[in-house]
Structures are given as structure tokens and as C-alpha cells.
UniProtKB/Swiss-Prot annotation:
This is Putative uncharacterized protein DDB_G0282015. It comes from Dictyostelium discoideum (Social amoeba). It comes from the Eukaryota.
Length: 56
């Protein structure tokens, strides 16, 4: 079995460039803030957009 597959999400995130991590943090904060103030259905599109851009 490939050891690469056993890497934790936290370890993987540490290997991303800092700029990329900052961008993810910014987007998640924005989505989180929006979730507090707007209807959940509208946010599903935002989350899908973020995930598809990250290729996860």
C-alpha cells in the first residue's frame, strides 16, 4: 500500500504553499460568515464552487 495515501489532512495542508492556505482560510471564513446571515440553500452553491476549484 502506498504510504502517500496515509498522510493526514493536517500534514497535507502543511505542505501546501502558505498563499494557498491563506486563500482557503479566507474562502471558508467568507462562506461561514455568509451561512450565518443568509439562507443555507444559497450557500450550497458556494461550497460546491469552492470544492470544485480545489479539485477535491
Amino acid at each position: 500500500m502506498n504510504d502517500q495515501k496515509n498522510i493526514s489532512i493536517n500534514e497535507a495542508i502543511k505542505q501546501f504553499p502558505q498563499e494557498f492556505n491563506n486563500r482557503i482560510g479566507f474562502e471558508l471564513n467568507r462562506i461561514n460568515t455568509n451561512l450565518r446571515f443568509s439562507h443555507f440553500e444559497e450557500q450550497r452553491g458556494n461550497m460546491f464552487f469552492l470544492m470544485s476549484n480545489l479539485n477535491v
